[in-house]
C-alpha cells in the first residue's frame, strides 16, 4: 500500500508540496493536512520531480536483485548507493542546497524500493526471476513507470555525464537485453 491507498484507509502519511511560490505551497499544504496527513513544503520542484523518476528506477533495481535472490545486506548497500547516485545527479542537473535524506527524497525511495506493493519493485522482481520485459508488463496489468523513466534519465544523463552505475545497469537489462545475472554481478563491483 503506497501513499494513495494508505490515505484512503487513514494511515498516517506525509506529503511534500513542491512549488516555486512558498505562499501557494503553504496554502495547499494547510488544505491537505489532516489528523493523519502531515505536510511540508519545498521549492525544489525540479529536484523532487527528478527524484520521483529515479526512485522508480532504483526500485526496479532492488526488485531485480530480489528476483535474483540477493539478500537484505546487498539490498541495503544497493539503496545506499542509489541515494548517493541520486544526489550526484540532482546536484549536477539542478544544483540546490537540498538534503536528500529528507523524506521527500529518501523516504520516497525507501518505500518504493522496499514495498511489496510497489509496481516498480514488482516489475524488477519479475525481471530478476527471468521474465522478459514484455511478459512482465503484460502479466502485471499495471504500468511500472520506472521502465520509461530509466530511458528518460539515461537520455538526460548523456548531456551531463554523471556516474550512474545503477541507472546504467537497469538500462542495460531493460533496453539492451543484457542478462540481469551478468549485469548485477558487474554492478556489484562499483558499489561501495
How would you describe each model-predicted region?
Residues 55, 62-70, 91-192:
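NAD(P)-dependent Rossmann-like dehydrogenase/reductase catalytic/cofactor-binding core
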Residues 1-9:
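Single conserved hydrophobic/aromatic residue that forms the stacking wall/gate
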Residues 12-99:
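Internal alpha-helical scaffold of NAD(P)-dependent oxidoreductase catalytic cores
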Residues 6, 26, 121:
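Alpha-helical elements of the RecA-like P-loop NTPase motor core of helicases
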Residues 1, 79, 146:
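Short, conserved glycine- and acidic-residue-centered signature motifs
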